[in-house]
């Protein structure tokens, strides 16, 4: 509303438009804010919406920095370091990356001097992050939590989990990307080093939250490409199966899982009315996650079912080891 009002006043006074730069850490953020602004402007007048469409730019951006949710321990550490209590303080890793589409209507600061990467199209960078970083993070979160690992750096101390994450990134996610002029092997190795940072104490439970909102971009989009190409994706299958096992609500030690997800009520209903043998087909009925296509694809259903049965039979850690042999 504020953006629309500001643009309305500038148009009324014959002032030039400005660039709306979204800093929200969501996919396709430029188009999201553009659609919101145009939708609200259209309710005021078609002329205003048309003027915004013609004169305002909405560059997409991608940010990358691992920032775990604050805990009592992290807040206490910060208090000791600073000598003051700050309830809003957060811990984060040293690495930082900001990629911005170079599409500004009235000039811009020379942000590249400070390390910002100005690009023509942010989508390839966004896909690289979502599939290689976030996808492997989710893989480690679901399977690591099931195996008893509370933090991502603990997963990295397990050679099998580390190798699985690396193969997932390079063998199964990287081939689905269209980014150029990036050394994806070096990128994958840098991600593994970042994941191994013991100071972050990034909880697998936190990363596993809201999986229904994350799974499509992080894993399922890549799987669809493999299905089209008839290429192998055993670790992606295990990742999806790991999510299914996780939302079923019990880890490998028999402990209850506090599943936090907008669809958790649906998960509970499915778990209450399905056996392990029926669990995959029951969860695949969630079209808001899997769409209409994947549940009807026999190759997809067979791969996820096999991976899920492997998890039930062997447990998460041994299932990772066995999947590496495929």
Predicted regions and their residues:
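Substrate/ligand-engaging "lid" and interaction regions
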Residues: 1-326
